[in-house]
Amino acid sequence: MVFLSTKLYLWQMKMLFSEKYRPQKEEILKLIDSFDKEGENLGRGDRNVIKIFQLGDEKINIKSFKVPNFINKVVYNFFRKSKAARSFEHATYLINHGIGTPYPIAYLEENNPLFFGKSYYISQQLEADCTFRALIEILREFTAFTHKLHENNILFKDHSPGNTLIKKNGNQFDFYLVDLNRMDFKNLSFEERIKNYSRLTSKKEMVEIMSDEYAKITGKSYDKVFDLMWGLTAEFQRKFYRKK
């Protein structure tokens, strides 16, 4: 535990580092201290801030999660793992099962006896060749990658175009998942597996390619796969645009 300051309550920092990066712990903590003023912005949304920092001869990615609302400050302090902790644990699980994701370095949580505060997830910065959105021609390989997730009892709930990084490796492509805090680990039914493809695209021709590849991999009927995948995709699109 690292004690930060005293105002009303004593704030402390809980942290967990991967064994590989423990020797660089102090350097990483200095980067966290300078997070608000330094670093290269990678993305700044309404909820989270992502920055790139130099650590020795490599670049690392630090994601600062938005401080939760009053109720969730209590929930995350006592009852539920933080998004930072889940991201670290999920990344470790993926790495251990041969699934690509930027290597997890550490997570840190700031809290006091009553409330949860800031939290950070740190990983290697992966310089991707492209994202899923930019490479229609690799749909078949991506379909097989998603099937591999399911065979390892992994349900990536945020399986959407922006959360898959792609690197070219010779004549094939390697896939890396990011934004890992929403995952389940369980046996998946056929419908749950197919539904996991439903957020990836609204283009029928792409769904046809994924359905064809999925049918070849699993031995299931193409018509059965396509009818379910396209139906679930259309249902997701209706719900998505209804919210707008």
PLM region spans:
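AlphaC helix of the protein kinase catalytic domain
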Residues: 129-135
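Hydrophobic residue at the +6 position relative to the catalytic HRD Asp in the kinase catalytic loop
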Residues: 159, 163-166
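Conserved alphaE helix
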Residues: 137-148
